[in-house]
Amino acid sequence: MQNLLKNLATSLGREPFVADKQGVYRLTIDKHLVMLAPHGSELVLRTPIDAPMLREGNNVNVTLLRSLMQQALAWAKRYPQTLVLDDCGQLVLEARLRLQELDTHGLQEVINKQLALLEYLIPQLTPFSVASRVGWN
């Protein structure tokens, strides 16, 4: 994994990535945080998504969550990413990749897909967009 991340840093024209105390590597690309962490035989990419409209007080907006999950199912054949709620209830875009099958080019492709999906999802989570999609107008 170290060689993979070293090669990724080189190909992105960056200094070698350094893990934090929890072993998580943090990359900021196009103003988006992409966290990479080894998990057994996998490399997990995670990007938290700021989605205050997903919460209604202490509850989750089920209609919006259902819509987002349906979209995640639709892209599942083309993208390794899925949407998850973390332990704090925050929406996270996540991909799990087998380290044995991963090379630098493949990792870059997955990161690019992560960024593309973020650009697709984030506008849907603005107050106006959410209101029009779930009938809050």
Swiss-Prot record:
Tell me, in a sentence or two, what this protein's role is.
Answer: Functions as a specific chaperone for YopN. It could facilitate the secretion and the subsequent translocation of YopN.
User: Where does the UniProt entry say this protein principally localizes?
Assistant: cytoplasm
Query: Which cysteine pairs are covalently linked by disulfides here?
Result: none
KW Cell inner membrane (keyword) present:
yes
Q: How does it sit in the membrane?
A: Peripheral membrane protein
Kindly provide the name given to this protein in its UniProt entry: Chaperone protein YscB
* Classification via Gene3D superfamilies: 3.30.1460.10
One GO term of the biological process aspect = protein secretion by the type III secretion system
Subunit? Interacts with SycN to form a complex which specifically binds to YopN.
Q: Which UniProt keywords apply?
A: Cell inner membrane, Cell membrane, Chaperone, Cytoplasm, Membrane, Plasmid
Q: Where in the cell is it found?
A: Cytoplasm; Cell inner membrane
- Pfam families, alphabetized: CesT (PF05932)
Cellular component GO terms, alphabetically?
cytoplasm; plasma membrane
Q: Name its species.
A: Yersinia enterocolitica serotype O:8 / biotype 1B (strain NCTC 13174 / 8081)
Cytoplasm listed as a keyword: yes
